[in-house]
């Protein structure tokens, strides 16, 4: 049962870290786009890059990469934004495979506890030489408790996992939408091939 508890602690720690990271990665993209456009109008690409540099989050990082390649034309900017968007998406999804692993192994560890509990019950019956309800009940109790604990851990971690996935999806949709808006803004301001 202590192994299941460790699984829960590690899974919960990773989930909490991801939630904090994702909350810090969330940016008001409309406001950022407006700041970048204003900076671009007044000071060019360098001023717009400075706005991105001073803003946290994946959207600002993607914008910075695109603006950094602005002298090479809009096609290169677009490819840079798409490529770096994939990098940022990987950073957002970091650690999810561990949470998924803990979700999968927690019930298995619980079932392992069930088997161990049943073996202990049969050992107790064998040593006593007769079948007593108290001997069987002790082993079955251990079996049921470990199974229950494994299932509870998996359910809790699954809830966190699904919340994190929905948060990542929301950020990715905003990244994609904002990237299109950045490209449109640059085309509007005369950036050509």
Indicate residue ranges for each PLM-predicted region.
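N-terminal membrane-entry
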Residues: 1-4, 93-100, 145-146
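Hydrophobic membrane-targeting segments
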Residues: 1-31
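Transmembrane alpha-helical segments in integral membrane proteins
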Residues: 10-18, 153-164
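Predominantly long cytosolic amphipathic alpha-helical stalk/bundle segments
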Residues: 26-112, 116-130, 159-193
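Hydrophobic alpha-helical transmembrane segments and adjacent short intramembrane/lumenal linkers
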Residues: 129-144
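Hydrophobic alpha-helical transmembrane segments of polytopic membrane proteins
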Residues: 141-159
């Amino acid at each position: 049962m202590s192994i299941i508890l460790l699984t829960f602690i590690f899974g919960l720690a990773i989930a909490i870290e991801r939630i904090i990271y994702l909350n810090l990665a969330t940016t008001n993209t409309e406001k950022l786009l407006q700041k970048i456009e204003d900076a671009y109008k007044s000071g060019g690409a360098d001023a717009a890059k400075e706005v991105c540099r001073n803003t946290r989050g994946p959207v600002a990082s993607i914008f910075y990469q695109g603006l950094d390649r602005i002298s090479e034309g809009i096609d290169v900017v677009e490819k840079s934004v798409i490529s770096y968007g994939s990098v940022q998406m990987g950073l957002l999804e970091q650690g999810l495979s561990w949470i998924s692993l803990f979700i999968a192994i927690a019930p298995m560890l619980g079932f392992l506890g069930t088997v161990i509990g049943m073996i202990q019950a049969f050992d107790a019956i064998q040593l006593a030489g007769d079948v007593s309800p108290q001997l069987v009940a002790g082993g079955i109790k251990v079996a049921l408790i470990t199974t229950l604990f494994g299932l509870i851990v998996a359910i809790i971690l699954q809830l966190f996992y699904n919340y994190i996935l929905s948060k990542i999806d929301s950020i990715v949709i905003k990244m994609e939408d904002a990237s299109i808006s950045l490209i449109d803004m640059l085309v509007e301001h005369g950036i050509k091939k």
